[in-house]
Design a protein with these regions (language model features):
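Short helices/loops that flank or line small-molecule/ion binding pockets
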Residues: 153-164, 212-213, 333-342, 355-369
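Append "and occasionally in soluble cytosolic enzymes with long acidic Gly/Pro-rich linkers
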Residues: 85-90, 96-99, 112, 118-133, ...
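Surface-exposed binding/hinge segments that line
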Residues: 2-56, 69-82, 466
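Aromatic- and charge-enriched surface segment that lines or borders ligand/interaction sites
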Residues: 1-2, 25-27, 208-210, 215-217
């Protein structure tokens, strides 16, 4: 229904009608902004009813159908499929998907597609002024073979031996392998800014993560850039806010404790963090001292929260182990040590990726952890702060808000953001939301990793400078 006050009201699609062979009319029962309409519902895939209805007798039958013979919105159709070994695409001579010019600008796109078969499209998006380049869509090959490998090592060994031309890998190539493969004759390389982030989450449902001064103090003492530049040799890019640096218009000015503590020495960071705790009502039997330089601080003793609470002993910071991700593993060791220098008993615990996910994303476990490190891959339209921090998305209720962040002002801005009809309006609201997150610190955002990729020089891409790499685009 459309009555938002009704007990059984659910925001969503009210009706969906196929008007003709190329047009679908969608009616919504809510005021949808960019995030719900243009970047979600309007981009949903459609399945051909004539073909798929024969399998729609039950969920099990539908999932069991291979789909190899299904009509596709592509210039290619499935040809051969060898389970666990390879499959091939062949050019479909009856396709309507070929040709057409696409012109890319700094902040906009123009498409002129009219091949005499498909419905003609002439559209422009964003700012279509300034420098640009144009490419004509193919396909330019008749067959594409996808060879399946059991792991990345086997895939890149096949690449090195010339058996494959490109490896589809959303994580890209690790730096040492990238450097090794770049020296192989006939190999081209590309490096792109990633559309993601690695982060540390505080559980704001339980003490001490429930205390804002504690979260701010940890954020202040954590000299991420020291670790990234001096220990990890610059292989990752420091990230303070929710927006990757490539999304230049969306990146908000850094404010709050991260701005206050930027550029401070280790001694100054420690002193500032102690001041934050004291201003927040924390007490200690002895506040300790810092000898200066790179030496560790003499940690405070007898630290208690504003209401006399004693922080738990043996708190764990879960992070992927060095074998899975040496960057987060290393960062976790430093941040746990910095928390120890503030008088908190915290240990970095290397933990399997899936174990961390089960621990922090399961509703029944939502209060059974203190800190963890993981990462997110993000979408083209950056509406992720709503998913990660809106109170109605709390993981205790099955959502992605693992910290349990609950802030009425933030929620109100989320409501406005969800209705934003223009990118400019959405950016302004997003940056207001970011300012709250800089103050409240449910996440300590850590860094972003460039996407490194390699391909054989017999493959030609229209462009290789693309957000998050070639694998996640039409280039891959």
């Amino acid at each position: 229904g459309t009555d938002e006050s009704a007990e059984d009201y659910v925001a969503g699609i009210a009706s969906l009608v196929a008007v003709d062979d190329y047009t679908v009319e969608i009616t919504l029962n809510f005021d949808a902004g960019l995030s719900a309409w243009q970047y979600r519902i309007a981009q949903a895939p459609f399945l051909n009813e004539t073909y798929w209805s024969q399998f729609a007798t039950s969920r099990e039958d539908l999932l069991a159908a291979s789909g190899a013979d299904a009509p596709v919105a592509s210039a290619f159709v499935y040809d051969k499929v060898e389970q666990g070994a390879f499959y091939t695409w062949n050019y479909d001579p009856n396709t309507m998907w070929f040709g057409g010019d696409t012109t890319i600008y700094k902040s906009g796109t123009v498409v002129e597609w009219d091949n005499g078969v498909a419905p003609a499209i002439s559209q422009s998006f964003g700012d279509t002024s300034g420098d640009s380049f144009t490419y004509t869509s193919g396909p330019y090959v008749g067959t594409v073979e996808f060879t399946l490998y059991g792991d990345q090592d086997a895939a890149y060994l096949a690449f090195q031996n010339g058996e494959v031309d490109f490896v589809l890998n959303p994580l890209g190539v690790k730096r040492n392998l990238f450097d090794q493969l770049s020296r192989v004759p006939g190999v081209e390389t590309t490096a792109n800014l990633g559309n993601g982030m690695r982060y540390m989450a505080f559980n704001t449902r339980v003490f001490p993560g429930s205390n804002k001064a504690f979260r701010q103090a940890v954020a202040c003492i954590s000299d991420k850039e020291f670790v990234l530049n001096n220990v990890l040799q610059g292989v990752a890019v420091n990230m303070d806010g929710q927006m990757p640096e490539a999304l230049t218009a969306w990146v908000a000015p850094v404010t709050g404790v991260l701005a206050d503590c930027a550029g401070l020495s280790a001694e100054e960071r420690w002193g500032k963090s102690v001041e934050i705790l004291q201003a927040g009502g924390w007490t200690a039997s002895d506040w300790g001292s810092h000898p200066g330089g790179a030496d560790r601080a003499v940690a405070p003793t007898g630290v208690k929260g504003p209401n006399g609470e004693t922080p738990p002993s043996d708190m764990l910071l879960y992070a992927p182990g060095a074998g899975y991700d040496p960057l987060r593993s290393t960062m976790s060791l430093f941040i746990a040590d910095w928390m120890q220098q503030l008088g908190f008993d915290v240990t970095a615990r290397p933990t399997g990726f899936s174990v961390i996910v089960d621990k922090v994303f399961t509703p029944e476990n939502c209060e059974d952890w203190y800190f963890y490190m993981l990462g997110w891959g993000l979408s083209a339209f950056p509406d992720h702060p709503e998913a990660f921090f809106a109170s109605y998305n709390d993981t205790c209720e099955g959502g992605y808000n693992t910290p349990g962040f609950n802030n009425a002002e933030f929620d109100a801005l989320v409501g406005e953001f969800n209705k934003a009809k223009t990118v400019a309006e959405a950016i302004a609201l997003s940056q207001q939301m970011e300012a709250i997150l800089f103050e409240e610190m449910p996440y300590l955002v850590l860094f972003n990793v460039p996407t490194l990729e390699v391909y054989r020089n017999n493959v030609s891409f229209p462009f290789t400078d693309v957000l998050d790499g070639l694998t996640g685009t039409g280039g891959g």
